[in-house]
Amino acid sequence: MRKVLILCTGNSCRSQMAEGLLSSFSENTKVYSAGTKPEKVNPFAIKAMAEMGIDISKNTSNHADEYANIDFDYVFTVCDNAKEICPIYPNAKQMIHHSFTDPADAKGTDSEQLAVYVKVRNQLSDYFKDFADNNLS
């Protein structure tokens, strides 16, 4: 079974959504997510994923250091800050960086904020579906 770690700063939005998506795209892959400064999973991220039928409501936010000794096939950073201060994963076979907009920066009404989360979710979905199809099948 392949192991993938997805990192962002707060482990509350992007990495959580990416974990849920990649898990749904590849049954033979164990996907983890973590943050360099973990926060509670964002309710808008939970709602955006629920719209796709993926439940991340029971996910927890974890610190990146918790996974330092796991032999990962892939370690992703999905924000520039996480890339800059990412812990070293000496056992990772491949480190990959792809920055996505932080939906937590969204302003406006709840529906306007949710729309931003849905947009980022769709970008994550396209990216990680392509990755899974080309690397995990």
Question: Which residues does each predicted region cover?
Answer:
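Short glycine-/acidic-enriched loop or helix-start segments at secondary-structure transitions
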Residues: Q16-A18, P43, I85-I88, K107
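Short glycine-rich anion-binding loops that position phosphate/pyrophosphate groups of nucleotides
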Residues: S12, D80-K83, D102
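Cytosolic catalytic domains that perform sulfur/thiol-centered chemistry
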Residues: R2-V4, Y67-V78, Y117
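Conserved small-residue
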Residues: N11, M49, V75-F76, L124
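Mid-chain, well-packed structural core segment of small domains
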Residues: I70-N91, H97
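Phosphate-binding/catalytic loops
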Residues: C86-S137
